[in-house]
């Protein structure tokens, strides 16, 4: 009787051990499946964050470069017909001054946002800071777009003039000035495109949380 009880106890222990192993194996397989499905999502989130950082870095060069190019633009020429020295600089035109201010503000913000963007690369679960960046990114996009649009009208008048209003073009005399403000305008519109991509990138990143 004692041997039978002993055998039954051993069999019960064996059954419990097998059940424990099966449960452990099931949990291991479930955790491995979670790991397999989690890793691609983590890689994609990090990739989106890295792309956002790169876009911000290029946008910094676009905005600050445009502001510096426009803000240091001036030219002086001698009018042979009137024998006077003619001068022109960006501050003579309010739209160009607004252009410089808009790009400078946006460039300063983008520089300050770079550390936050780096933080998002290592902390893919951050949500509040992403919402703040998305809102401010949209405001900066509107600011730079308005500055570039306002400057475009002035640059066009400088090149083509307006015969109806009797405004002659000035680029025939101030060709260096016009070339520089035109180049600055191109850089600013490139920054507008980059800011649009940044907003889209931020929205996609936020939607994945």
From Swiss-Prot:
Positions in the Cytoplasmic compartment: 1-49, 117-130, 205-209
Transmembrane parts of this sequence: 50-70, 96-116, 131-151, 184-204
Subcellular location: Cell membrane
UniProt entry tagged with the keyword NAD: no
Tissue: Expressed in the root endodermis.
One Pfam family named in its UniProt record: CASP_dom
Key words of the record: Cell membrane, Glycoprotein, Membrane, Transmembrane, Transmembrane helix
Residues of this chain annotated as glycosylated in UniProt: 162
Superkingdom classification of source: Eukaryota
Membrane topology, as annotated: Multi-pass membrane protein
GO terms for cellular component: plasma membrane
Main location group: membrane
Region span, Disordered: 1-26
Family: Belongs to the Casparian strip membrane proteins (CASP) family.
Record's subunit section: Homodimer and heterodimers.
Name of the protein: CASP-like protein 1A1
Organism field: Arabidopsis thaliana (Mouse-ear cress)
